[in-house]
Swiss-Prot record:
GO terms for cellular component: cytosol. Residues 258-264, 282-286 are annotated as: RNA binding. This is Queuine tRNA-ribosyltransferase. GO terms for molecular function: metal ion binding; tRNA-guanosine(34) queuine transglycosylase activity. Zn(2+) binds at residues 315, 317, 320, 346. It comes from Cyanothece sp. (strain PCC 7425 / ATCC 29141). It catalyses: 7-aminomethyl-7-carbaguanine + guanosine(34) in tRNA = 7-aminomethyl-7-carbaguanosine(34) in tRNA + guanine.
Amino acid sequence: MNDSLQAIPNQPFSFFTQASCSHTQARAGQFFTPHGVVETPRFMPVGTLANIKTVTPEQLRGTGAQMILANTYHLHLQPGEGIVAAAGGLHRFMGWTGPILTDSGGFQVFSLSELRSIAEAGVTFRSPRDGEEIYLSPEKAIAIQNQLGADVIMAFDECAPYPADRSTVTEAVERTTRWLERCCKAHDRVEDQALFGIIQGGTYGDLRQQSARSLVEFDLPGYAIGGVSVGEPPELIEKIVKFTTPLLPEHKPRYLMGVGTYREMVQAIAAGIDLFDCVIPTRLARHGNALVRGERWNLKNSRFREDFQPLDQSCACYTCQNFSRAYLSHLLRARELLAYTLLSIHNITELISFTQKIRQAILHDRFSSEFASWLTSPSPS
């Protein structure tokens, strides 16, 4: 099958599977949004505060990025959803014309375990910025996201920690379902914003199944698997994803939250996942690390001081086309800010290109052979 676009549907949001792997559950698809088409499987860069750290929107477009993320919790704290709305919405505010997804802020709130209190109505917590008391409920999370104006918004959920006992996870699953119902009732921009539900359940298979069954009944435009990559070993993440993904509708996009390593993405794509996000490419860049063909290189290492090759001769990114490993090593040693921009551009391009290669392999039914080493290699310790 070729990679050409299908006819744009009448509905503002729809998902089509173009091809499937004959040996795994991997699939190549297209997710239509009001701000463009997302070709899946796809890695999505994270721009927590309405920017991809050190990278301009123009530079970001050059990486092949299609959909990006911003964070409701952080944008509520600074600058505030009212300012974003007054600017014309998130797209205009940050100068990004493609699709945007906003997380509900639930994960960030629940990570503030010492600063919060949970009740059925919502969560009260103290801002880590200034100690101010803040209240966030399903209704408020949706109202904030409605004002921000992203294409895809996430339901407010309760993310149980890892490890957690069964009763704690059960309570989180049941509350997540009740909160989703409230999110649906509060959501008043259904024509131009797709609300995704988030499957919880921790490491308990039956609770994952319970969560998926309950949330699928809401018939939402898409679903995410949450509560993973929160401290579990890699093999447990793979087990959860492999078990949970088939429980989600085939005709809806499936999003695995907070995952973005090579191996984890390949394994998840084989299970049927379409979308990924992670801060890895920019975070590694800020620490002087480059992602190169499945490896992680520390450019501060002395072996790069007189290495005048590009990071990756096969990479088409701006960094690899114009600069050497030695130059990047020099910038890092001199603590020049340009180093972080150039490495971020490359790392984002690398992960997007990686998922694009997987997509092409699926379209031509070569996924299981071309990515066999990633599918069969043992989990890292």
